[in-house]
């Protein structure tokens, strides 16, 4: 991987982190909470500028970033501090970073599908020797329903065919404005169940947005399943990568064009959002959990106890990040 690719990958990763932190920043500002510092990167200071009450900084280590909100980590006498806001405002501010990651993911995917084309249920090609061709289905036909259920998302069609495991499926098709019904049985090929059909790609902003939401939803489901398997010991920790691994993957995708890089950025942004919502100390999800715990217990858990918990969580998180960096260097560089 070239030096240029590494630098570009680091910049792109920093932009994703900046997007996350901007979510916290924007929510805090909108809800009247004082923001003392907005930083991209961590560690030694490279650049700093004061604008109004907020200090904007760029730091040397591209391993994260932060938005320093008044009173977030302890008591503050400032009337505009985080701690003096109602519980719902705290939750909004804490969740805004992940929300921004989700928005960024959808925006990036929308751009990709608008440019490259979004999936449709109209067929572009019918392959020789597969069930669809044998049943007389033609390119240009549109899938309207399967087994009486309407379908307008190609990936749902793919999932339904794969889940059928070769059982008969009733396809309602449209050709030249007329409907017809045919029964197909999927054929297994290389471990998958296939009908031998390929969808047509359409360059439509509406379809692009719909495909972006569909892809985001299915990816979130897959990530959620992975997190459950990881914490229950059913998935390997070898599949988890750190900053070095992420930068390496972005650099590798750069070889295949900008579309691949943007797609990977969208998935990484989604991953950042979901990881930050995990209910673990020091993460946004852990802080949100404490907001509800303190609401239910009527603040029987004080700022000091919460602060110590998050501090321990941060130490463990930094240790995990250091371990992942060490392992990624050995895996991707050495």
PLM regions with names:
Residues 81, 85, 179, 185-274, ...:
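Functional transmembrane alpha-helices
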Residues 107, 111-115, 273, 277, ...:
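Hydrophobic membrane-targeting alpha-helices
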Residues 132-154, 309:
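Conserved PDZ fold ligand-binding element
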Residues 4-8, 12, 88-93, 259-263:
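Alpha-helical transmembrane segments of integral membrane proteins
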Residues 13-17, 68, 101, 268-276, ...:
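Alpha-helical transmembrane segments of multi-pass membrane proteins
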Residues 4-77, 278-297:
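Small-residue-rich helix-interface/hinge motifs
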Residues 8, 19, 30, 37, ...:
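Internal alpha-helical transmembrane segments
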Residues 138, 144-145, 158-200:
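PDZ-domain C-terminal substructure recognizer with occasional recognition of PDZ-binding tails
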């Amino acid at each position: 991987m070239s030096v240029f690719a590494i630098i570009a990958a680091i910049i792109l990763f920093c932009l994703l982190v900046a997007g996350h932190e901007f979510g916290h920043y924007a929510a805090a500002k909108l809800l009247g909470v004082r923001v003392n510092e907005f930083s991209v990167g961590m560690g030694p200071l490279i650049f700093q500028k004061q604008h109004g009450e907020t200090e904007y900084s760029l730091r040397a280590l591209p391993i994260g970033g932060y938005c320093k909100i008044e009173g977030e980590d302890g008591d503050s006498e400032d009337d505009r501090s985080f701690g003096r806001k109602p519980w719902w405002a705290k939750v909004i501010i804490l969740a805004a970073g992940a929300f921004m990651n989700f928005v960024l993911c959808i925006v990036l995917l929308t751009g990709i599908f608008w440019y490259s084309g979004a999936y449709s249920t109209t067929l572009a090609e019918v392959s020789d020797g597969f069930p669809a061709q044998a049943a007389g289905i033609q390119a240009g036909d549109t899938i309207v329903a399967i087994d009486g259920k309407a379908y307008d998302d190609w990936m749902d069609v793919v999932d339904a065919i794969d889940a059928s495991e070769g059982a008969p499926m009733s396809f309602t098709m449209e050709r030249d404005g007329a409907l017809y019904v045919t029964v197909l049985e999927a054929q297994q090929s290389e471990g998958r169940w296939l009908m031998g059909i390929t969808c047509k790609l359409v360059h439509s902003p509406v379809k692009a947005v719909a495909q972006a939401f569909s892809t985001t939803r299915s990816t979130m489901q897959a990530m959620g399943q992975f997190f459950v398997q990881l914490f229950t010991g059913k998935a390997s920790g070898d599949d988890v990568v750190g900053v070095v691994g992420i930068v390496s993957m972005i650099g590798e995708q750069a070889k295949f064009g900008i579309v691949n890089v943007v797609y990977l950025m969208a998935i990484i942004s989604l991953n950042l959002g979901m990881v930050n919502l995990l209910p673990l100390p020091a993460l946004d999800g852990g802080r949100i959990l404490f907001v509800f715990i303190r609401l239910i217990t009527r603040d029987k858990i004080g700022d000091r106890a919460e602060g110590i918990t998050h501090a321990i969580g941060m130490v463990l998180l930094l240790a995990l990040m250091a371990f992942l960096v060490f392992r990624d260097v050995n895996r991707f560089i050495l």
